[in-house]
A protein has these predicted regions:
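Alpha/beta-hydrolase fold catalytic core
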Residues: 2-66, 90-92, 314
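Active-site loop/oxyanion-hole signature of alpha/beta-hydrolase fold enzymes
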Residues: 96-137
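Residue in the alpha/beta-hydrolase core beta-strand immediately N-terminal to the catalytic nucleophile
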Residues: 134-135, 159-161
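Gly/Ala-rich beta-loop-alpha elbow adjacent to hydrolase catalytic centers
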Residues: 138-142, 146
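Flexible "cap/lid" loop of the alpha/beta hydrolase fold
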Residues: 161-189
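Catalytic histidine-centered segment of alpha/beta-hydrolase-like enzymes
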Residues: 290-302
Length: 314
């Protein structure tokens, strides 16, 4: 009996200590969020779509419009793409869409099927006065949206430039670890991510050309836009969304794909490359360029990619 009482006492004390630690972290996080509020000022224009605010960033005044579409879970699409689009804005009009749940856009707890996502992207561009046709530049998971865009509204898409973009085949046997993803969301919501060294240091911060001020802004956004409810809904729908695109017709537009070494994708290099090769081989005149870097290719090889994009468009 004494041993049992001692065990219960130890368990009670342990839980109490844990609760105190979590409370301290939570309060600290709230204080930091308040201090960082001044950094969370939209870098572009905010438009309203169906009662929700969506962030749209534009730069440059070229005849052709490049629309950058971020990968799943990228906290700050604008700053993530900046190293690359700053190399292109002298020649083209640059647009970055920050979907709901990302960057400076609203967080919503709504279904994220492919039609909803695409309709919101198109409506946001219309609200911002941006007209097509567009050269879509999707990273990772946004490759699915870009392909669907070209399938459904071919007159609006003149080309696709995939920045290590995902293709439908990649999600056929994709196993979602929703408990882990939701645990990450919980950890960020209560502030645990703040005490994990280096977790806010994105590829854009580590390898891109962001200024110290922009890095500071990125970190502030990270703690507000990591594993948001909207992102979780998006992940839950990705297999269905990919299947819809896979069942559609192949886009009849020029496609250039930049392919990474697979690091950071969840697949090994051989698997990841095979997915992309299988897809591009079906596209008439499609081209793939291999890069020996990890998944966020635009943060590593921005100079090389910018050069190839200019050659491709010309």
């Amino acid at each position: 009996m004494k041993a049992l009482r001692k065990a219960k006492r130890i368990l009670f004390i342990s839980l109490l200590v844990l609760m105190i630690i979590i409370t301290i972290i939570y309060v600290y996080n709230k204080i930091q969020l308040k201090r960082e509020a001044k950094l969370f000022t939209p870098l572009g224009e905010i438009v309203e779509v169906n009662g929700h605010k969506i962030s749209i960033y534009t730069e440059g005044h070229g005849e052709k419009t490049l629309v950058f579409m971020s990968g799943g879970g990228t906290s700050s699409p604008i700053l993530d793409f900046k190293s690359l689009f700053s190399q292109l804005s002298a020649d083209y009009r640059i647009v970055v869409i920050e979907k709901l749940g990302y960057g400076f856009s609203d967080i919503v707890d709504e279904k994220r099927d492919i039609d909803t996502i695409l309709n919101q992207s198109r409506a946001a561009l219309t609200q911002a006065g941006i007209e097509g046709p567009f050269i879509l530049c999707p990273h990772s998971m946004s490759g699915i949206e870009a392909l669907y865009w070209a399938q459904k509204y071919p007159e609006e898409v003149s080309a696709i430039i995939g920045l290590d973009m995902a293709v439908p085949e990649a999600y056929e046997n994709y196993k979602l670890n929703m408990p882990l993803i939701k645990a990450a969301a919980f950890a960020n919501n209560i502030g645990i991510t703040r005490i994990l060294p280096g977790i806010a240091e994105s590829e854009a911060i580590k390898h891109g050309t962001l200024s110290d001020k922009e890095k500071e802004i990125y970190r502030a956004i990270f703690f507000r836009r990591t594993a948001t409810k909207t992102m979780l809904k998006e992940v839950e729908e990705i297999k269905n969304n990919a299947k819809i695109v896979d069942n559609g017709k192949l886009p009849k537009v020029p496609i250039l794909m930049f392919s990474s070494n697979g690091s950071g994708t969840g697949w090994n290099e051989k698997q990841w490359t095979q997915f992309q090769e299988n897809f591009i081989n079906k596209i008439s005149g499609g081209k793939i360029i291999y890069l020996n870097c990890s998944h966020y290719v635009h943060d590593h090889e921005y100079l090389n990619i910018a050069r190839e994009i200019k050659a491709f468009i010309s």
